[in-house]
Every structure is written in structure tokens, then in C-alpha cells.
């Protein structure tokens, strides 16, 4: 596996691979890779001849009071994960490589980004759409792999690919969880031991919602209320949002009549965690 830092070096490989008729899978990440990322890379390596993993903490998707400066980084560890999972290239650019100082062009999305995490993190999805578009242009992948834990991100990227006519298949991969149910996340490393135990309230509350749905509950108010009450049992937890939306459009629903996404964002101490599940009729 090669570790590359420049766009021009990546493009040299892409040009040769395309010349040879090889398929390319892209796994965009912000590094500090865990088993969730590993599962994306492994799937990409099974479905493509070559796999590029981008390892880039994208500054323009962070807000002014967010964790850009302290976001965990460990390139050596990431390289080991990528090598074992079958990646061909680990692309680790500096921000100055990805963005011109005087750049005036960005990729934005509307409506679908005005809810859930997008409503709480202004500008976040402009940063996501811009960096993903740039990565698509740099790597020319046949397929790109994203985790379902970031459900809104997956929906936004799928819509962007459709709207901008990218000839790329977006592959959404299942959430990978710890043994106690906590969704794998790089931000889990911020949690103290006490907070780590408390964080299981996210998956517990979602499991309760699944039980209600499995037992025939159709009223979204009742589902959300049950989640809120369950999370309220954990003293270290503070709800950011609890939402039930159409799984494709992400529009709010009041009654379960179609495939839905149940999504939550919860602060455990000062650490904001997200989780979700999709329930199909």
C-alpha cells in the first residue's frame, strides 16, 4: 500500500488504473480509523480492483466551536488498518493541498441539509459536499463507501450524486457496534470511562423504539416520547434531537406509513454522539 500526500501523485495512479481498465473504490474518512471504517475498506476491496482511502480532517466542515483542533489523528495506526483491510492507497493531504487560500467555489445543498445534524451544524454539509466532490474529481471512483451511522450524510451524498450527474455508485454500509451496542465512532475516544458506560443509552433507546415498531406502533409521537423518556434515565445524557423522518426524503412524518429513519443526537457530557436505524414497512 502507498501513502500519498499530493493530488498529482494520486492522479498518476488513477490514470494508470483507468488505462488498465481497473475498477476503483473510494472510502472517504477523517482518519483515526476504527472497525466501522475497516468494514468499509474490506467491502470496497471485495467489490473493486483498487481501493483508495482518504484520510483527511476536513477543516471546512467544522464549526467555529467544534473539535477540529483536537480531532484524534494517528496516521501510522490508520496505515496499519488500511493495509490489513486491503487498501491500495492511503491519501493523506494537508489542507493546503485540498484548498486554495483564495478559493471561492463550494458545493452546497438545501432542504435535505436543513434538518437533523444540518440544522444544528450550519455550514457542515457545505463542507462535506465540497470535500466529497473534490475527492470524486481527484480519484474518479466507480463506487464510494459510506457508513450508515451518518445517515443524513449518506442521503445528502446520494442526492448530490444524482443532481450533479456523477457516474458513481454510492454504497451505504451497516453500522458497526461495540459489544454493548454503542456505535463505533472516532469521537468515542473522547469519552471518560463513566461517559463510555452512559453512552450505551443511545442504542438502548433505539432498541426500545424498534420494539414498539415491531409491536405495531405507528404513532411517531409515541415513538419519540419513548426514546426521550429512556434517554432521560441517564443523568449524563442531554438530548440534541430525536427525529423520525422518511428514510429517503428525510422529511418529518407523524405516522409510520413508509420506510422511516429514526435518528438521535445526544450529548454525553460534552461529547455529541449520533445513532440511528432504518425501519421498513
Curated annotation (Swiss-Prot):
CDD domains reported in the protein's UniProt record: PanC
PANTHER family linked to this entry: CYTIDYLATE KINASE/PANTOATE-BETA-ALANINE LIGASE, PANTOATE--BETA-ALANINE LIGASE
Keywords attached to this entry: ATP-binding, Cytoplasm, Ligase, Nucleotide-binding, Pantothenate biosynthesis
Assembly: Homodimer.
EC primary class: ligase
Presence of keyword Lyase: no
Localization terms from the record: Cytoplasm
Organism: Clostridium acetobutylicum (strain ATCC 824 / DSM 792 / JCM 1419 / IAM 19013 / LMG 5710 / NBRC 13948 / NRRL B-527 / VKM B-1787 / 2291 / W)
Binding site residues for beta-alanine: 61
GO biological process, one term: pantothenate biosynthetic process
Primary location recorded for the protein, binned into one broad class: cytoplasm
Active site: 37
GO CC, alphabetical: cytosol
Catalysis: reaction(s): (R)-pantoate + beta-alanine + ATP = (R)-pantothenate + AMP + diphosphate + H(+)
GO MF annotation list: ATP binding; pantoate-beta-alanine ligase activity
Pathway: Cofactor biosynthesis; (R)-pantothenate biosynthesis; (R)-pantothenate from (R)-pantoate and beta-alanine: step 1/1
Chain residues that bind ATP: 30-37, 147-150, 176, 184-187
More info: The reaction proceeds by a bi uni uni bi ping pong mechanism.
Domain of life: Bacteria
Summary of the function given for this chain in its UniProt record: Catalyzes the condensation of pantoate with beta-alanine in an ATP-dependent reaction via a pantoyl-adenylate intermediate.
Family annotation (InterPro entries): Cyt_trans-like, Pantoate_ligase, Pantoate_ligase_C, Rossmann-like_a/b/a_fold
EC number from the UniProt entry: 6.3.2.1
UniProt name for this protein: Pantothenate synthetase
Binding site for (R)-pantoate: 61, 153
Pfam family, one: Pantoate_ligase
Protein family (similarity comment): Belongs to the pantothenate synthetase family.
Amino acid at each position: 500500500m502507498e501513502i500519498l500526500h499530493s493530488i498529482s501523485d494520486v492522479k498518476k495512479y488513477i490514470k494508470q488504473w483507468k488505462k488498465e481498465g481497473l475498477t476503483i473504490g473510494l472510502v472517504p474518512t477523517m482518519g483515526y480509523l476504527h472497525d466501522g471504517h475497516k468494514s468499509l475498506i474490506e467491502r470496497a476491496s471485495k467489490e473493486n480492483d483498487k481501493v483508495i482511502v482518504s484520510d483527511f480532517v476536513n477543516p471546512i466542515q467544522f464549526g467555529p466551536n467544534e473539535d477540529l483542533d483536537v480531532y484524534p489523528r494517528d496516521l501510522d495506526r490508520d496505515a496499519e488498518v488500511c493495509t490489513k483491510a486491503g487498501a491500495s492507497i492511503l491519501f493523506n493531504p494537508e489542507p493546503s493541498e485540498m484548498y486554495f487560500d483564495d478559493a471561492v467555489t463550494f458545493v452546497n445543498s438545501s432542504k435535505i441539509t436543513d434538518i437533523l445534524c444540518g440544522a444544528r451544524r450550519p455550514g457542515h454539509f457545505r463542507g462535506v459536499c465540497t470535500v466529497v466532490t473534490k475527492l470524486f474529481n481527484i480519484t474518479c471512483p466507480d463506487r464510494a463507501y459510506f457508513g450508515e451511522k451518518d445517515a443524513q450524510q449518506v442521503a445528502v451524498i446520494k442526492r448530490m450524486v444524482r443532481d450533479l450527474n456523477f457516474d458513481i455508485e454510492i454504497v451505504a454500509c451497516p453500522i458497526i457496534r461495540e459489544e454493548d451496542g454503542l456505535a463505533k465512532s472516532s469521537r468515542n475516544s473522547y469519552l471518560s470511562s463513566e461517559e463510555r458506560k452512559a453512552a450505551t443509552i443511545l442504542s438502548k433507546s433505539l432498541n426500545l423504539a424498534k420494539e414498539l415498531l415491531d409491536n405495531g406502533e405507528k404513532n411517531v409521537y409515541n415513538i419519540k416520547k419513548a426514546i426521550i423518556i429512556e434517554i432521560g434515565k441517564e443523568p449524563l445524557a442531554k438530548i440534541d434531537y430525536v427525529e423520525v423522518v422518511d428514510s429517503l426524503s428525510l422529511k418529518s412524518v407523524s405516522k409510520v406509513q413508509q420506510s422511516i429513519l429514526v435518528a438521535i443526537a445526544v450529548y454525553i457530557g460534552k461529547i455529541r454522539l449520533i445513532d440511528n436505524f432504518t425501519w421498513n414497512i
